[in-house]
Amino acid sequence: HIINLDKLTYAGNLANLKDIEGQPNYTFVKADICDFERIIQLFKQYNIDSVIHLAAESHVDRSIKDPFIFAQTNVMGTLSLLQAAKLAWETSETGYDHKLFYHISTDEVYGALDFDGTFFTEQTKYQPHSPYSASKAGSDHFVRAFHDTYGMPVIVTNCSNNYGPYQFPEKLIPLFINNIRHGKALPVYGKGENVRDWLYVVAVSYTHLRAHETKANL
């Protein structure tokens, strides 16, 4: 059974989930991951044994204007989920057996690449350059700390830019498409020399599912 928890901030839209809302193995819950007591209650109510954590503030420009909300959601929200999972799983009959906290991060925690053919690996030193990437780096460290300190089974993966249907139009690809459709100018960031990798949402979702199933052995 899948419990989909979302605060439904400005970029959220329940209409995107119309085709699955009536499925018997799916439940939507409108809640804030920073609401610790509510998260604890949900773990108890639904006997949650696995978390795939994608909830985050993710727009770099917005993080520059208001870094506090990024620290609150991305760092404290992640800590709220981790602590709720710890309390629920440590006291269960099977402990951490067949439990998993899967945390989706970003390649932005590694900083920027030069045009010299180098690339990031999971061993690359963290060098976040924006409040957004700094908040995600902080959440990554908390996830790994819960593994090292309490033995919680975790995965951390680092995605590049995602795109796909229904994406909020502040993101680059839907922004470009909308501007082209309406005859508006296309924005140029910096000197226009930035290079980005893009991952289609279906491929990303399949990868997350496979990683989760393999690690959790569910």
Indicate where each model-derived feature is located:
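N-terminal Rossmann-like NAD(P)+-binding domain of SDR-like oxidoreductases, especially those catalyzing
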Residues: 1-162, 202-210
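Conserved catalytic core of two-component sensor histidine kinases, primarily the HATPase_c ATP-binding
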Residues: 60, 185, 194-195
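A glycine/serine/threonine-rich, flexible loop-to-helix segment
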Residues: 116-118, 169-177
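Residue-level detector of conserved catalytic or cofactor/ligand-binding positions
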Residues: 208-218
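Short, hydrophobic secondary-structure boundary micro-motifs
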Residues: 72, 187-190, 218
